[in-house]
A protein has these predicted regions:
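FAD-binding core/adjacent interface of flavoenzyme oxidoreductases
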Residues: 1-6, 66-158, 177
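Beta1-alpha1 glycine-rich phosphate/pyrophosphate-binding loop at the start
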Residues: 2-79, 170-177
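Conserved phosphate-binding and hydrolysis motifs of nucleotide-dependent enzymes
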Residues: 9-14, 115, 159-164
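Glycine-/small-residue-rich active-site loops that bind phosphorylated ligands and cofactors
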Residues: 13, 38, 84, 99, ...
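Generic non-transmembrane alpha-helix signal with a bias for helix starts/N-cap capping motifs
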Residues: 61-62, 140, 164
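Glycine/Thr-rich phosphate-binding loops of Rossmann-like dinucleotide-binding domains
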Residues: 120-121, 165-167
């Protein structure tokens, strides 16, 4: 019986780990679970999509589940969230976010590559409708919908890391102050 490797997370680290696992073991059954709609997208390109420099959001998609299946023989499940890890049973519990069903999957090796989680500021107003966090393509779509409205003239960015600085440039391209 061949090893089963489960990868939790399907963006940069998860897809890279899954592809590496395939190179290390051609016979292993490899299953990748991603709770979002997309795998392997260019997260650093999100500000350029918001600015309009990247016009088509599909340009942000580096790989598709179909590509991974065909090229690497890796089963990819998007909109599937691992809700529980049962180390004693060597199983994960996975929820299909579209269907609402749950299923347990056995593993021999488990790779956790879930990435970072943006922290909402614990201040009054942080949950207002025009307060955004940028982590994925869906977030970028929501920000873009907000900033293209003609009444939007100003933006505030909290965070001065690379993405924050690129967002400042993106808003500038859009004519925002």
């Amino acid at each position: 019986m061949h090893k089963r490797i489960i990868v939790i997370g399907g963006v940069a680290a998860g897809t890279s780990a899954a592809a590496k696992a395939r190179r290390m073991d051609e016979r292993a059954e490899i299953i990748l679970f991603e709770k979002g709609e997309y795998i392997s997208y260019a997260g650093c390109g999100l500000p350029f999509y918001i600015s309009g420099l990247v016009r088509d959001r599909n340009e942000l998609l580096v790989q598709t589940p179909e590509f991974f299946s065909k090229r690497h023989n890796i089963q990819v499940y998007v909109q599937h969230e691992v809700t529980e890890i049962l180390p004693d049973k060597r199983e994960v519990v996975v929820k299909d976010l579209k269907e609402g069903t749950e299923k347990e999957y056995r593993y021999d090796k488990l790779i956790i590559a879930t990435g970072a989680v943006a922290k909402k500021l614990p201040i009054p107003g942080a949950d207002y409708p025009n307060i955004f966090i940028l982590r994925d393509i869906k977030d970028a779509d929501n920000i873009l919908k907000a900033v293209i409205k003609p009444e939007v003239k100003n933006a505030v960015i909290v965070g001065a890391g690379l993405i924050g600085l690129e967002m400042a440039e993106s808003f500038s391209y859009r004519g925002l102050k």
